[in-house]
Amino acid sequence: MPRFTIHDLAETIDARAAAGGEGSYTRKLLDKGAEHCAKKFGEEAVETVIAAVENDRAHLIAEGADLLYHFLVLLKARGIKLEEVEAALGKRTSMSGLEEKASRKE
């Protein structure tokens, strides 16, 4: 089975956003705006936490997949590329977690 990466998912979201069409859930989410996409992401985050607290491995994996999808849709809605998030993560790897947290603007 070929490996499906988060970059593959981002490319799929980009393609569906560009193609549009009534059958595209991605397009429907984006058409409702970034605020709606943020709400959906929040709902999925809560469902992911619940699955983790319940210690339900299969449910956590499924909700984690939903969470990643909705995060990427939210990024798309706000015009942010996955590579920008990766760059932010990359900057953090050069310092400890405590140093990174202290460097953030409140």
Curated annotation (Swiss-Prot):
It is found in: Cytoplasm. Pathway: Amino-acid biosynthesis; L-histidine biosynthesis; L-histidine from 5-phospho-alpha-D-ribose 1-diphosphate: step 2/9. Its EC number is 3.6.1.31. The keyword ATP-binding applies. SUPFAM superfamilies: all-alpha NTP pyrophosphatases. Disulfide bonds: none annotated. GO terms for molecular function: ATP binding; phosphoribosyl-ATP diphosphatase activity. Gene3D superfamilies: MazG-like. The keyword Methyltransferase does not apply. GO terms for cellular component: cytoplasm. Keywords: Amino-acid biosynthesis, ATP-binding, Cytoplasm, Histidine biosynthesis, Hydrolase, Nucleotide-binding. It catalyses: 1-(5-phospho-beta-D-ribosyl)-ATP + H2O = 1-(5-phospho-beta-D-ribosyl)-5'-AMP + diphosphate + H(+). GO terms for biological process: L-histidine biosynthetic process. Belongs to the PRA-PH family. HAMAP family: HisE (MF_01020). This is Phosphoribosyl-ATP pyrophosphatase 1. The gene is hisE1.
